[in-house]
C-alpha cells in the first residue's frame, strides 16, 4: 500500500507562498472554517512558513556570497544617528 501525501504541492515561488499564506490567515481569522478545515489550514500554513523561511535563508546566503568582504558588522548607534 502506498502512502498518500495529504499536503498540497509546494508553491513555485516565495510570492505565491506568501499570497496563499495570507489567504489562509484571512480565512482562519474570519472564523469561516470548521474545526477539521482549520487544522488542515494551520498545517498548510506551517508548511508555507517553512518554505518561505528556507527561501529567505537561501537568498540571504546568496547575498552574503555576492557581497563577500564588503560585509561589515551592524552598528545600531550609527544607524540611529543617521536617521536623526
Curated annotation (Swiss-Prot):
Primary location: cytoplasm
Enzyme Commission code(s) on record: 3.1.11.6
Subcellular location(s) of the protein: Cytoplasm
GO cellular component, one term: cytosol
Catalytic reaction annotation: Exonucleolytic cleavage in either 5'- to 3'- or 3'- to 5'-direction to yield nucleoside 5'-phosphates
The keyword Hydrolase belongs to this UniProt entry's keyword annotation: yes
Keywords: Cytoplasm, Exonuclease, Hydrolase, Nuclease
SUPFAM superfamilies in alphabetical order: XseB-like
GO biological process: DNA catabolic process
Role played: Bidirectionally degrades single-stranded DNA into large acid-insoluble oligonucleotides, which are then degraded further into small acid-soluble oligonucleotides.
Protein name: Exodeoxyribonuclease 7 small subunit
Native species: Herminiimonas arsenicoxydans
Underlying gene: xseB
Amino acid at each position: 500500500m502506498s502512502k498518500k501525501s495529504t499536503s498540497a504541492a509546494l508553491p513555485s515561488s516565495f510570492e505565491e507562498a506568501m499570497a496563499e499564506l495570507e489567504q489562509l490567515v484571512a480565512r482562519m481569522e474570519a472564523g469561516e472554517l470548521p474545526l477539521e478545515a482549520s487544522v488542515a489550514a494551520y498545517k498548510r500554513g506551517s508548511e508555507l512558513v517553512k518554505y518561505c523561511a528556507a527561501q529567505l535563508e537561501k537568498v540571504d546566503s546568496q547575498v552574503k556570497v555576492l557581497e563577500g568582504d564588503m560585509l561589515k558588522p551592524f552598528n545600531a548607534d550609527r544607524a540611529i544617528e543617521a536617521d536623526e
